[in-house]
Amino acid sequence: MIANNDQYKEYMKGTTTVGIVCNDGIVLATDKRATMGNLIADKEAKKLYKIDDYMAMTIAGSVGDAQSLVRIISAEANLYKLRTGNNIPPHSCAMLLSNVLHGSRHFPFLIQLIIGGYDTIHGAKLFSLDAVGGLNEETSFTATGSGSPTAFGVLEEEYKKDMTINKGKLLAIKSLTAAMKRDAFSGNGISLAVIDKNGVKIYSDEEIEELSNILYK
């Protein structure tokens, strides 16, 4: 399997991203560090993308591959809305990406993705995808990247079913903070988004700092 390929593992170094299912929406969070080997190449790397008004995605892995997929799925989401007048359902978006990735499985995109979205029929949904199109619907939480083992430890210990978005935001920050303390390839701050019935909200650095102060006061 591709997950056992040494080259794939090399590309997977760096990054921590998390997704959390809450009773009223989805929380996504990432760190901001991009690395090239042992070099910190970027301290403000964008790893959290708004796809449309009700869907966002995190990326981990090869930057060029991930950005290409962001452009593809953003264009498809826009076309879907132009044709139907509605936003593309999150599960349809995830399935489309899965098909794109599987179609390139012999020359794979070296990425891991988390998609969070909301629609009026299915509610809040969270999906994870691997490099060859493996698609999982997550019912609690997920994490990707080199810092994910530490993040998973915090999430496993503190996640509660049907937790509120407010608690989910704090848990996302706590899991990212723990990962950044232990993983040299993750760091330089946090990006945070919430997706619920009101749409996608990307939090500012000041808002994230306020949440961190609540968590660690």
From Swiss-Prot:
The entry assigns this protein to a family as follows: Belongs to the peptidase T1B family.
- Record the organism: Methanococcus aeolicus (strain ATCC BAA-1280 / DSM 17508 / OCM 812 / Nankai-3)
Q: How is it regulated at the activity level? A: The formation of the proteasomal ATPase PAN-20S proteasome complex, via the docking of the C-termini of PAN into the intersubunit pockets in the alpha-rings, triggers opening of the gate for substrate entry. Interconversion between the open-gate and close-gate conformations leads to a dynamic regulation of the 20S proteasome proteolysis activity.
What InterPro entries does its record include?
A: Ntn_hydrolases_N (IPR029055), Pept_T1A_Psome_bsu_arc (IPR019983), Pept_T1A_subB (IPR000243), Proteasome_bsu_CS (IPR016050), Proteasome_sua/b (IPR001353), Proteasome_suB-type (IPR023333)
Q: Mention one GO biological process in which this protein takes part, according to its record.
A: proteasomal protein catabolic process
Localization recorded for this chain is: Cytoplasm
What is one Pfam family matched by this protein? Answer: Proteasome
Q: What is its EC number?
A: 3.4.25.1
Predominant cellular place of this UniProt entry's protein:
cytoplasm
Q: Which Gene3D superfamilies match?
A: Glutamine Phosphoribosylpyrophosphate, subunit 1, domain 1
Reaction catalysed? Cleavage of peptide bonds with very broad specificity
Superkingdom of the organism of origin = Archaea
Q: What does this protein do?
A: Component of the proteasome core, a large protease complex with broad specificity involved in protein degradation.
SUPFAM superfamilies recorded: N-terminal nucleophile aminohydrolases (Ntn hydrolases)
| One GO location term (cellular component) | proteasome core complex, beta-subunit complex
Q: Which GO terms describe its molecular function?
A: threonine-type endopeptidase activity
**What residue intervals traverse the membrane?**
none
What PANTHER family is this protein classified in? ATP-DEPENDENT PROTEASE SUBUNIT HSLV, METALLOPROTEASE TLDD
Indicate the residues that form the catalytic site: 15 (nucleophile)
Q: Write out the entry's keywords from A to Z.
A: Autocatalytic cleavage, Cytoplasm, Hydrolase, Protease, Proteasome, Threonine protease, Zymogen
**What is its quaternary makeup?**
The 20S proteasome core is composed of 14 alpha and 14 beta subunits that assemble into four stacked heptameric rings, resulting in a barrel-shaped structure. The two inner rings, each composed of seven catalytic beta subunits, are sandwiched by two outer rings, each composed of seven alpha subunits. The catalytic chamber with the active sites is on the inside of the barrel. Has a gated structure, the ends of the cylinder being occluded by the N-termini of the alpha-subunits. Is capped at one or both ends by the proteasome regulatory ATPase, PAN.
Which ranges are cleaved off as propeptide? 1-14
- Encoding gene (name): psmB
The identity of this protein, by name, is: Proteasome subunit beta
